[in-house]
Amino acid sequence: MEIISLKRFILLMLATSSLLTSNIFCTDESRMPNLYSKKNYDKYSEPRGDLGWEKERSLTFEEVKDWAPKIKMNKPVVNKMPPSAANLPLRFGRNMEEERSTRAMAHLPLRLGKNREDSLSRWVPNLPQRFGRTTTAKSITKTLSNLLQQSMHSPSTNGLLYSMACQPQEIQNPGQKNLRRRGFQKIDDAELKQEK
């Protein structure tokens, strides 16, 4: 790979810049060289012959009159409401029953006033589970409530609840150095007995 000398690089840059500036000046009409006159330039710049462009056609007043009946403007469709309730939002006295039927009320969510017991089971589909069983929302809630009740009656849960409810040992025996809660001490003692 050759290294270009500084003189050659400067010559290359000057030649490139002179070519670019000459092209810019030639495109400008005010700086056109004297070889061609402006008349010749205008003559050569016009397109020769018919290149397939159609002449633009101007419209007459009669044609514009003929178009008027063909164009029909449709009025916008507006839902008519009684004038007393037209500008009032729902919280200022319009009732839901006036504008909506009871059938439309059936599809509203709970936060908008729909109160039905089977709404959860209706919206949760029956999905096939393992071994071909199908579960519904009611059976899922039953299972969860049964698990919660079973866990509440287990001995480890009772011990934890007891330890949370009892008072700290420092309040009961202020002279003792061991400041652990009595419930945790009982659980630790029970674990030591099980390990032996």
Curated annotation (Swiss-Prot):
Primary site of residence: secreted
Keyword Amino-acid biosynthesis: no
Propeptide span(s): 22-57, 95-99, 115-121, 134-196
InterPro entries according to UniProt: FMRFamide-related/fGRP
Subcellular location per the Swiss-Prot or TrEMBL entry: Secreted
Modified residues (Phenylalanine amide): F92, F131
GO terms, biological process: negative regulation of gonadotropin secretion; neuropeptide signaling pathway
GO cellular component terms, A-Z: extracellular space
UniProt keyword Chloroplast present: no
Signal peptide start-end: 1-21
Keywords, in A-Z order: Amidation, Cleavage on pair of basic residues, Neuropeptide, Secreted, Signal
Family according to the record: Belongs to the FARP (FMRFamide related peptide) family.
Name of this chain's protein: Pro-FMRFamide-related neuropeptide VF
Protein's organism: Bos taurus (Bovine)
